[in-house]
Regions:
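Conserved AdoMet
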Residues: 2-102
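Conserved SAM-binding loop of SAM-dependent methyltransferases across substrates and taxa
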Residues: 108-123
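Short hydrophobic/aromatic beta-strand or adjacent loop that forms the aromatic wall/cage
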Residues: 251-256
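A short glycine-rich, Lys/Arg-flanked "PGG" loop and its adjoining helix->strand segment in the class I
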Residues: 216-228
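Extended basic-aromatic, gly/pro-enriched interface segments that bind polyanionic ligands
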Residues: 128-202, 206-217, 239-241, 260
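Conserved beta-strand signature within the Rossmann-like core of class I S-adenosyl-L-methionine
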Residues: 228-236
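Residue-level signal for inorganic ion chemistry
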Residues: 84, 201, 226
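Conserved class I S-adenosyl-L-methionine
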Residues: 96-109, 128-131
Length: 260
């Protein structure tokens, strides 16, 4: 008789099935989230839940979405975007060199689209591009649609709301001139190749879910992809301990500059 699947065995099966290695996440937090889903679907044990994931594509999509923590909002944490608009972007665009921006863990696209709006107001002679990546293909599909409920637009400045959104049937549709400036791509931050030559990288509210060892590994890889003088922005509730170890210098809360 086969032994009942435990959490370690479940992690192994999930990694093989969807490529997500749960061992990099904080165990207590991740187990709690999985157990919440199991209760919702009335799965008494890991074996039962795994069968559900294998048999029902909707449950699997919900599982992937739930574990990859897809929360997003346009211009979330307004102080960060004020710093971007007033200081960081003008400094990076000085001299007319092309600007490469990467939004990692972009969720439904609110962050990279917010960046594209800010960049569209800079000197029109400046060249820039925004890359947005996420693990969840279903979320990326929603991001490419550019269709949002009103509650995600709470912090959108009025000038951007009027210029770049059209309301239909209670939803807000993003104008194609902004949508077309963002390139979306699926990426597993734990295993896939990282971008290089970036001037600005944002990975916000992602590190809090990982173990300390994984956090440090990701920060090191992000820093390697950043040009000297470029900026790295994390979540306002996150912090990089000893940023100099990674060649970073703290500029403001959640904002770091690569110094070497």
């Amino acid at each position: 008789m086969a032994l009942a699947l435990d959490y370690e065995g479940f992690k192994h099966k999930i990694k093989a099935k969807i490529g997500l290695d749960l061992s990099h996440y904080k165990e207590q937090q991740m187990r709690r989230r999985i157990h919440q889903l199991m209760q919702r679907y009335k799965a008494a044990d890991y074996d039962t839940f795994l069968r559900m994931l294998n048999d029902d594509g909707d449950i699997l999509r919900h599982f992937t979405d739930y574990l990859t923590i897809n929360t997003s909002q346009f211009f979330r944490d307004p102080a960060i975007y004020r710093a971007l608009e007033m200081q960081l972007l003008p400094e990076l665009l000085k001299g007319g060199k092309p600007l490469k921006v990467w939004s990692a863990g972009c969720s439904v696209g609110a962050e990279p689209y917010s960046l594209a709006m800010l960049l569209s107001e800079q000197d029109p002679a400046c060249s820039w591009r925004v890359l947005a990546t996420d693990f969840d293909v279903n979320i990326l599909a929603k991001a490419k649609e550019g269709k949002y409920p009103d509650n995600l637009l709470t912090h959108v400045p009025e000038r951007f709301r009027k210029r770049y959104f059209n309301e239909r049937d209670g939803l807000f549709f993003l104008d194609s001139q902004i949508k077309n400036r963002v390139q979306f791509r699926r990426q597993n931050l734990l295993t896939d190749r990282y971008e290089t030559g970036c001037n600005l990288i944002l990975c916000r509210n992602v590190f809090i879910y990982f173990t300390v060892e994984t956090q440090e590994n990701l920060i090191d890889r992000f820093t390697q992809g950043l040009q000297a003088g470029g900026f790295f922005i994390i979540g306002c509730s996150e912090m990089i301990t000893n940023p100099a170890r990674f060649g970073l210098q703290k500029v403001k809360p959640a904002i770091y500059r690569k110094i070497k």
